[in-house]
Amino acid sequence: ALPISPDLTKEQRNGIIEGARAICSKVNYTGAGTVEFIVSEDGTISFLEVNTRVQVEHPVTEAVTGVDIIAEQLRIAAGEPISFTEDPHSTGHAFEFRINAEDILNGFAPCPGTIVSFEPPTGPGIRVDSAVRSGSIIPPYYDSLIAKLIVWGPTRDVALRRAKHALREFRIDGV
């Protein structure tokens, strides 16, 4: 799955927001979490699941809302109120690409080793979340995720152009 912020109608977006609110209200949930819905090709929205933790895809939501979800989660855990009082508005379109150390010619098997060179892309609407750098070792024991590339644009087309450019610019050698 490619985490994206889909183009939704106002009615679809409001339905998702109200559905998520109703679920959280019913169980008196306070904190950061994820209420997931799936949108079919015909526009039908279906509830998928609830997670009482932040998902790996949270930067997509951060990109389109401007809300630092992790900072808000820490505020709530510290007993502080969230930093905003109105619902965040979604703007633009965002994609998240998971950059993994995998062997595409061997069924995407993990590809451990030492990262010789790590050169992430930069530019408007480009965010890279990673804890590796040149010289980092990717062990065979854990998830092969190296980085998450999050790309935002004011429109889907701009976001796609930026994503294509960023993926061409991303350089990782050694694994």
Residue spans for each PLM region:
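ATP-dependent carboxylate activation and anion-phosphoryl transfer catalytic cores
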Residues: 1-175
